[in-house]
Amino acid sequence: MADKKNLLLLFDHPTEPVFMDKGGNGTVFDVPDSYVTDRYNQMCKKVQRRVSSASEKNVQVKEIAIPDLSCSMRLGRSEQFSIFLKSHRKMASHLIEIFTKMQTVDELQSVAVYARDRVNPVLFNYALSVALLHRPDTKDLELPAFAQTFPDRFIDSKMLRSMREESFVVERSAARLPVVSSVKYTASDLDVEHRLWYFREDLGVNLHHWHWHLVYPIEAPDRSIVDKDRRGELFYYMHQQIIARYNAERLSNHMARVQPFNNLDEPIAEGYFPKMDSLVASRAYPPRFDNTRLSDVDRPNNQLRVGIDDMKRWRERIYEAIHQGYVLDTNNEKIVLDDAKGIDILGNIIEASDLTPNSTLYGDFHNMGHILIAYSHDPTNKHLEYAGVMGDASTAMRDPIFYKWHAFIDNMFQEHKRLLSPYEKQELSFPDVRVESIQVESQGQVNRLTTFWQESDVDMSRGLDFVPRGHVLARFTHLQHHEFSYTIKVENSSEATRYGYVRIFLAPKLDDRNAPMLLEQQRLMMVELDKFVVTMPPGSHTITRNSTESSVTIPFERTFRNLDKLEELQNFLCGCGWPQHMLIPKGRPEGLRFELFVMVSNYEEDKVDQTVADCGCSIAASYCGLRDRLYPDRKSMGFPFDRKPRRGSEILENFLTPNMCAVEVIITHEDRTEKLREVPARS
């Protein structure tokens, strides 16, 4: 029986033939002759003998009858794959179906080995990843980070060349020096948007977006892979939180909040020049110049034809449905957009996933927005150019237009939310429970948090093809903060033990004009920091919680990790979650004022009846849910800030009920870099 961990080796060196050595210990797949592509048929055995002599392990591949892969092979090996393109999703869905229907790990390994050299490498990575995440016999595997198999999505072409040079020239991997990523490679300080390079180009932020779309694919052969609990609402909330976090960073850099891209006829003011090469396509990601206008896209090779008028029509129909309070399914039956399920239905319509009740009527709005922008430089394929970074889930967040587009998408969701009745005091209160105070402490300072720059290394060797083996480190500079802890004082004045759900949010106190924020504005900038359950016997209690325990984030080591020490991370199998080092905004050198909000709600009302102890993932559930489980909170995502405030609660102070508390917190940024000192010797 095959060792299922060998399946992970198929992600290594994605453009090299499958019979080449894989993994840190030089594992070789013993590939049947019939599985070798025509190109390598004559030399495969000769190469394998050479490679096998230095390898530590050989993996026998069982020869089986291979299913028809022709659908998934329609996309060329050197073309660009995009989950936003329906034709590409169909190809991926076909391959996912083949992978998930294999009866045993042996059969899965055989068909994956066969497919690997025949289908597009990125499509293969996506399909195998989705299959492994959802097969009962492989869902506990630790998937390699996408950055370590496709480093070209995360570093510029100059750095990629330097890494190849380091790998080729310095034979002994222990003597190789890290290749340092520049912080100024996409634009100069003349570009105001470049102040946010550390957010848009952050490794963990972009990995989060890619991994979220792996866990929540838009389309799949088995509806259960897509139809996860509150999937549409999660699409709304995860992206809403990205915009809230982005706006906090903009305020940290003396910039106005992002303006929604709500007029498709207007030019896109911001250009973007990614400076990245696609290893699969062997060409550069195309730039977008300032003031580029969107055009109808007609690219028959991608079975793609979508126009500005299509987008406007879909938008009007979605807004009409929101204002009417219902959508129509394919049988012309009404589906009510109620308080509980309405946002979930809208999420599946706007994205749009396989779960949309009527794709003919409401279209593919969000996905086609990505596509129109991604092909704005060559909408008719006249110049044979591939899509820009907005066409790829792993690169889209690098582009300033991503945030303007998603700010507009969020406005559509907020239109629905504003039509819902505000929460009244009795819906927000927790009888007999009072939050007396909250404070944060970091480095001995109370209610003061500090951010700074930090260097960290990522081993990207397994994404560098056709170069000598061994570790090749990329060194990134990223935002970091000192750890902090919450101290919450709560009183339970009843005579019974109560169970509370602690909800912690953070939002700027002043707007971009330095004026106090009204709650209707501020609630849209509330960033969720944590959510957890507490037990409160009668009396007074002090609750403490460390920032590293956040329900929003995945551990720092999950982003910056050693490829050969994955056993240390077996408790963090999902990989979906916001990066820990980006938990709080950057702040300013002089300090930026935020309001820290805590609410203790009634867990007996909020809890979902299920067991989560053995779900096999870190509990970064706020943005990603729980694998194979219901979302662990009955309340709407973003509660209590997902609706407009009740009358008389124009500011946060007036919104508070006894089970809530808020305090001012100052975030200060120190413009210094904590450098790594471990430098291998050249010998």
UniProtKB/Swiss-Prot annotation:
Q: How is it modified after translation?
A: Upon activation, a trypsin type protease cleaves prophenol oxidase to yield the active enzyme.
Put simply, this protein is called Phenoloxidase 3
Record bears the keyword Oxidoreductase: yes
Biological processes annotated in GO: dopamine metabolic process; melanin biosynthetic process; melanotic encapsulation of foreign target
Q: Which domain of life is it from?
A: Eukaryota
What residues make up the catalytic site? Answer: 351 (proton acceptor)
Gene3D superfamilies found in the cross-reference section: Di-copper center containing domain from catechol oxidase, Hemocyanin, C-terminal domain, Hemocyanin, N-terminal domain
Cofactor info, note text: Binds 2 copper ions per subunit.
Q: Pro-region residues? A: 1-48
**Alphabetized PROSITE patterns for the sequence:** HEMOCYANIN_1, HEMOCYANIN_2, TYROSINASE_2
User: Which reactions does this protein catalyse?
Assistant: 2 L-dopa + O2 = 2 L-dopaquinone + 2 H2O; L-tyrosine + O2 = L-dopaquinone + H2O
Q: Quote the record's binding site residues for Cu cation A.
A: 209, 213, 239
GO terms assigned for molecular function: catechol oxidase activity; metal ion binding; tyrosinase activity
Identify one Pfam family in the record.
Answer: Hemocyanin_N
Write the record's keywords in alphabetical order, separated by commas.
Answer: Cleavage on pair of basic residues, Copper, Disulfide bond, Glycoprotein, Melanin biosynthesis, Metal-binding, Monooxygenase, Oxidoreductase, Secreted, Zymogen
Which source organism? Drosophila melanogaster
Question: What cofactors does this protein use?
Answer: Cu(2+)
Recorded hits in PANTHER family, A to Z, give: LARVAL STORAGE PROTEIN/PHENOLOXIDASE (PTHR11511), PHENOLOXIDASE 2-RELATED (PTHR11511:SF4)
Q: Which Cys pairs does UniProt list as disulfide-bonded?
A: 574-617, 576-624
Where are glycans found on this sequence?
358, 492, 546
- The EC designation for this entry is 1.14.18.1
InterPro entries the UniProt entry points to: Di-copper_centre_dom_sf, Hemocyanin/hexamerin, Hemocyanin/hexamerin_mid_dom, Hemocyanin_C, Hemocyanin_C_sf, Hemocyanin_N, Hemocyanin_N_sf, Ig_E-set
User: Lineage of the native species?
Assistant: Eukaryota, Metazoa, Ecdysozoa, Arthropoda, Hexapoda
Binding locations of Cu cation B: 366, 370, 406
